[in-house]
Design a protein with these regions (language model features):
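Pre-Walker A (Motif I) flank of P-loop NTPase domains
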Residues: 1-4, 71
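P-loop (Walker A) phosphate-binding loop of NTP-binding proteins
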Residues: 10
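Conserved substrate/cofactor phosphate-moiety recognition/catalytic segment
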Residues: 13-69
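Conserved beta-strand scaffold positions in the cores of enzyme catalytic domains, especially
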Residues: 31, 99-101, 158-161
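Glycine-rich phosphate-binding loop used to anchor ATP phosphates in small-molecule kinases
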Residues: 54-95, 99
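Conserved phosphate-donor/acceptor-positioning beta-strand/loop module used by diverse small-molecule
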Residues: 95-115
Length: 181
């Protein structure tokens, strides 16, 4: 059975790194990193353009197409609104695929520090750091972390995987174990 694996977690926790590793080790899997879609939209750096509203439906369509073709999707994306998670779960269900949720977590202080230590110098990385700083920096990240924890009780099938700093391979092994369970 094909799967749509939603890899959730606070910004900078390692979702994209683990998703890339997973896709590399599972040929044919689509690494649907929504952040990589933003730069494809003209004017994406202007917050007033609401690019998320454009790329989320595109991501849903990409996931549906991939699953319909009998291939897996891994989605490394912070989502703390149940309605957004439900949309991806619905796509999986409609395409006859399993919907698997894994939430990568560290303590709040460590999660915020990991965002600050992130070395992504891509256009998206610079843009994202600028937006976070503009909207409160660590306070914004703390709020995002709290919102993620608040929705977890409503997602009983989500498996939490603890992430230690500089332990990518160990965390990847925990991810694989969570997906087998």
């Amino acid at each position: 059975m094909t799967s749509l694996i939603h890899l959730n977690g606070p910004p900078g926790i390692g979702k994209s790194t683990l998703a890339a590793r997973y896709a590399h080790r599972h040929p044919g899997t689509l690494n649907l990193d929504i952040d990589s879609l933003h730069p494809l939209v003209g004017g994406w750096e202007d917050e007033d353009n609401h690019t998320h509203e454009i790329v989320r439906p595109i991501a849903l369509a990409m996931a549906a197409t991939q699953l319909r073709g009998g291939r897996d999707v891994i989605l490394p994306q912070y989502l703390a609104r149940l309605t957004e998670i439900d949309k991806f779960e619905q796509v999986a269900r409609e395409e006859g695929a399993a919907f698997r949720e894994v939430v990568l977590l560290a303590g709040k202080t460590e999660a915020i520090a990991r965002f600050d230590r992130r070395s992504d110098d891509s256009a998206w990385g610079r843009h994202n750091r600028r937006l976070v700083a503009l909207h409160g920096g660590p306070a914004m990240l703390a709020s995002m972390y709290d919102r993620l924890l608040e929705i977890l009780p409503a997602r009983p099938d989500a498996v939490v995987v603890r992430c230690e700093p500089d332990a990518v391979e160990a965390t990847y092994a925990l991810l694989i174990e969570a997906l087998r369970g």
